[in-house]
UniProtKB/Swiss-Prot annotation:
Keywords: Secreted. This is ESAT-6-like protein EsxG. One of its GO terms (cellular component) is extracellular region. InterPro entries: ESAT-6-like_sf. Belongs to the WXG100 family. CFP-10 subfamily. Forms a tight 1:1 complex with EsxH. Gene3D superfamilies: ESAT-6-like. The keyword Lipid biosynthesis does not apply. It is found in: Secreted. It comes from Mycolicibacterium smegmatis (strain ATCC 700084 / mc(2)155) (Mycobacterium smegmatis).
Amino acid sequence: MSLLDAHIPQLIASEANFGAKAALMRSTIAQAEQAAMSSQAFHMGEASAAFQAAHARFVEVSAKVNALLDIAQLNIGDAASSYVAQDAAAASTYTGI
């Protein structure tokens, strides 16, 4: 029995919604990388070297963004499950009103 006023279904829905938004972000990053790879052939000489350096940095940063999205989604899920578990465990210690 929960005595605290928390909207658990909202926490669960937030995790699912965040997952959908994270998937959209990942898709956008993948599309940007595909567009960059398609335009790579147009660069020559110094422009080609600059493009390759910028693209390498983009790939590095996009990997970090994806990792942060994974961590954020896990944290939202953990918040809901740990809240429910701790609240249920503490509910037995409450005395009747």
